[in-house]
Amino acid sequence: GKYICITNVHTTVMAYEDDNYKNIQNKAALILPDGNPLSSLSRKKGFKEAKRVTGPDLMHEIFKISEEKGYKHYFYGSTEDTLSQLNIKLKERYPKLNIIGMYSPAFKSNVSLENEKKIKEINASNPDFIWIGLGAPKQEIWMSLHEGKLNGVMIGVGAGFDYFADKIKRAPMWMQKYSLEWLYR
């Protein structure tokens, strides 16, 4: 499968300073701007319809569509506690959402390929979407290493799991609108 990166100013600066990370970002099937500075710059560069896309907003939209279409979802990342809460909250909010698996990998200082058993397990569940919640840059590196090995579209959503599990509250809409979400955190 391919992967989608949702990039913000921080990850854009990281890509500017690290050629390997830049190549990982550039290799993505799609890069979405999470932040008004990036979406504004995109519009100035000719992408007239560019809008800010956050991980949680994208998740919500895809979950709604998935309830109608029956798409299957696998969640990889975060902690077991967060995944447990995420499972409960998603079933409450999206009762028809087809969650086919969740896995909390051991926290390691470096990103390495998961063993063949885990890859086969994920692929056997036949996911349409594989949500990756490892945080940047770890999730982008992980997705790049697994491109073509996993079936389904991988989407790195950082703390998206925490928001949907009600572990972290999102900033009020007015703060999001004026690019002040960082201040709320």
Q: What are the language-model segments listed below?
A:
Residues L38-S40, K138, G160-A165:
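Short gly/pro/ser/thr-enriched loop/turn and capping motifs at secondary-structure boundaries
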Residues S104-N110, G152-R185:
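Short, flexible loop segments at boundaries between secondary-structure elements
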